[in-house]
C-alpha cells in the first residue's frame, strides 16, 4: 500500500512500477485514485471554508443577542431578531452542506482506500524484471549437489518404509492435502522444528507462540486481497481466519501501536501450524507432503528502521542458508523477478534445496522485504528520537517448514541400504539416534 501523497506526486513512477510487474490492467487505477484523492481533498477544503463561515456567523450572533436583550424599541428588536433568525437559518444550511460534504469525503476516501489496497508496492531497483517465476535469477549456490549411484524413491515411499506416513487414512478423515506422520518420521519432523527454533534463538530472536486465528483487518493488513482469497480459511460466522503462516499474527501483534525507536528492531521467531487452501492444479512433483492444506512451520519476522531493512534482508536469507548447510543440505538462492513478487513485497528471494531424486532444486524458504506496506496498512508507527512518527519496515522469512525440509533431509541422507543418516545437529533432538533403519 503506497502513500497517497507519493502517488499524487509521482504518478508516472507508480505506473512504470505497475508495468514492471506486468499488471497493465491496473494502470487506470493510478488516475482513478488521484481523482478520488482530489475529490476527497476538495471536500475537506470546502468543509474547512464552511466551518470558518459557520464560526463567523455564530460569532456575529453574540453581539446581536446582547443588543436584543437591552433593546426597548420594538421596531429595532424586530430587526435584530430578523438578523438573528437569518443567521440561524444560514448556520442550519451550513450544517446541511457540511453533512453532504462529509458524506462526499467519506465515500471518496473509502473508494480511494479500496484502490490503494490493489496498487502494488514499489519494487526495489535491484529486482530483476520478468513476468513470472521462469524469470527468477539464480544468485549463488551453497554446497555440492549430490548424485547418488542408486535410485531414490519418492519421499512418501521412503516414509512408508519406516511406517512413517499414512496419506490414505488422512484422506478418509480430512480429504486430500492432509497426512498422518508417525514413528521416527514424526520424531524427525519435531526435531527439525525444535532445531529451527533453537537456531533462531541463538541468533538473538525472541521465541513466540502466536494466536493461530486472526481478525479480518489483520489479514487485510498483511496480505493482498488476491493472496487472501487464494490462501485463507475463514471461520464461518466469526471475524476470524486460520493463519496461513505465523508471520500474519506476529506482524499483527503491533497493529495500531506506536513503538519507541529504541525498541527497534523487533525480532521474533515463532512456531505455528499453518492452514492454506492451496487452490489450483498441482503437478506430479507436488504430491505427498509437498503442497498441503495443513503443515507446521518455524518463521522469523523483523520490524526495523527503514534504513536497516536491506541489511536485515541480507541477514535473514543467509540464516536460512546457514541452517540448511548445518544439516548438510545443498541449497541455492533464487532472486524473485518483478512479476513473481506479491503486491506488498519490495524484494524477495527463495532458498531452494537440492533434490537428488529430481536432480534439481525445489523451494524450501521464502525471504521477503515488504518495506512499509504492512506497517501502513496496520497503522504500525515508530516515534523517533525527535518525537516525529514514521513507518517501520517489516520483513519475514521461513526458518524451516518441516514437510519440505523432511523431503530434503530424507533424499539427501538416504543410504543405499534404505537407512537414513540423522545429521549431527539433529541427533540431540532424536534421542541420540545417528541412523533411521527402515522397518521393511
Question: What residues fall within each predicted segment?
Answer:
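N-terminal alpha-helical targeting/anchoring segments
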Residues: 1-145, 160, 164
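TRNA-recognition modules of translation machinery and tRNA-sensing kinases, especially anticodon-binding
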Residues: 27, 141-440
Amino acid at each position: 500500500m503506497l502513500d497517497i501523497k507519493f502517488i499524487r506526486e509521482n504518478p508516472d513512477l507508480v505506473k512504470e512500477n505497475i508495468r514492471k510487474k506486468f499488471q497493465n490492467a491496473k494502470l487506470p487505477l493510478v488516475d482513478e485514485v488521484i481523482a478520488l484523492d482530489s475529490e476527497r481533498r476538495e471536500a475537506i477544503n470546502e468543509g474547512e471554508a464552511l466551518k470558518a463561515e459557520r464560526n463567523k456567523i455564530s460569532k456575529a450572533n453574540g453581539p446581536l443577542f446582547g443588543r436584543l436583550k437591552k433593546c426597548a424599541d420594538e421596531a429595532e428588536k424586530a430587526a435584530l431578531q430578523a438578523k438573528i433568525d437569518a443567521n440561524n437559518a444560514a448556520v442550519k444550511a451550513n450544517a446541511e452542506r457540511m453533512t453532504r460534504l462529509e458524506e462526499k469525503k467519506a465515500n471518496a476516501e473509502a473508494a480511494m482506500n479500496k484502490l490503494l489496497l490493489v496498487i502494488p508496492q514499489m519494487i526495489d531497483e535491484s529486482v530483476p524484471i520478468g513476468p513470472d517465476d521462469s524469470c527468477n535469477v539464480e544468485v549463488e549456490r551453497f554446497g555440492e549437489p549430490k548424485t547418488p549411484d542408486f535410485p531414490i524413491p519418492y519421499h512418501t515411499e521412503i516414509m512408508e518404509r519406516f511406517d512413517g506416513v499414512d496419506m490414505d487414512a488422512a484422506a478418509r478423515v480430512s480429504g486430500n492435502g492432509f497426512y498422518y506422520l508417525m514413528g521416527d518420521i514424526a520424531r524427525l519432523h519435531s526435531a527439525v522444528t525444535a532445531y529451527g527454533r533453537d537456531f533462531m534463538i541463538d541468533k538473538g530472536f525472541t521465541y513466540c507462540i502466536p494466536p493461530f486465528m486472526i481478525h479480518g483487518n489483520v489479514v487485510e493488513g498483511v496480505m493482498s486481497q488476491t493472496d487472501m482469497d487464494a490462501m485463507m480459511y475463514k471461520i464461518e460466522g466469526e471475524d476470524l481466519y486460520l493463519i496461513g503462516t505465523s508471520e500474519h499474527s506476529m506482524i499483527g501483534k503491533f497493529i495500531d501501536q506506536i513503538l519507541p525507536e529504541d525498541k527497534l528492531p523487533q525480532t521474533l521467531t515463532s512456531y505455528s501450524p499453518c492452514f492454506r487452501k492451496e487452490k489450483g492444479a498441482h503437478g506430479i512433483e507436488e504430491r505427498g507432503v509437498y503442497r498441503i492444506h495443513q503443515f507446521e512451520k518455524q518463521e522469523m519476522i523483523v520490524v526495523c528502521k527503514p534504513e536497516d531493512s536491506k541489511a536485515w534482508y541480507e541477514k535473514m536469507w543467509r540464516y536460512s542458508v546457514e541452517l540448511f548447510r548445518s544439516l548438510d543440505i545443498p541449497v541455492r538462492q533464487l532472486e524473485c523477478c518483478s512479476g513473481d513478487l506479491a503486491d506488498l513485497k519490495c524484494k524477495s528471494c527463495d532458498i531452494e534445496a537440492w533434490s537428488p531424486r529430481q536432480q534439481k532444486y525445489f523451494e524450501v524458504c521464502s525471504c521477503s522485504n515488504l518495506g512499509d506496506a504492512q506497517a501502513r496498512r496496520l497503522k504500525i508507527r515508530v516515534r523517533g528520537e525527535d518525537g516525529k512518527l514514521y513507518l517501520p519496515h517489516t520483513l519475514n522469512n521461513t526458518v524451516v517448514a518441516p514437510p519440505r525440509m523432511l523431503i530434503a533431509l530424507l533424499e539427501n541422507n538416504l543410504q543405499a541400504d534404505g537407512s537414513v543418516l540423522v545429521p549431527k545437529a539433529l541427533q540431540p533432538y532424536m534421542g541420540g539416534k545417528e541412523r533411521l533403519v527402515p522397518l521393511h
